[in-house]
Amino acid sequence: NIISCQFLSFETQNRRYANDEEWQKERDLERHKVQVIKQKMDACPLFISWGYGEAPINLEPYVNVESNGEKHKMAIMYVNNNYMDMFGLKLKEGRTWNDKDQFAQYKMMINETARKLFRIKDINEASLQTESRLWWSVGTDESKNPAYQVVGVIEDFRTGHLSMGDAPLAILYDEGENPTEPLMAKLAKGKRKEA
């Protein structure tokens, strides 16, 4: 019982402006819209939780990952704990994200399929190496590509067509505050018609 809709777009980022004042005016208007959406969603009794992001469907393995000499393709998601709760993603072992986690880090959670595929027995000793960087951030050495520490394992869930089986999945941390992504909201029990 999750709905999704697009409220905002990249308009202010992709548009050309005549001057800085015009750009600032548009930016301020966009920030105001974000605040209004937040206030309305937080106050609405129709929803249990809400956030921004893409639904975890149609995830295809596209990132080359290596561990102990084995290479496989994995699907990648960038999410926070609110997103995991909204979609009912269940932790099997290890931990989910905490206050110390940030976007620019080399930690990931994986699903059971990835664990089996890479034959990981002890996640405390597991690391996965991506073929290329998955993120860029100011102040990081972009010539390096360290391996990712596995901090948790989640239960498998379908990310695509039922006949395709479970895709190996890596979950990286994201604050989930990008209002240009679709807004998703989990409906409160018995509120489907009202929503």
Residue ranges and their predicted role:
Residues I3-C5, M108, L128, A170-I171, ...:
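Well-ordered beta-strand positions enriched in small/hydrophobic/aromatic, beta-favoring residues
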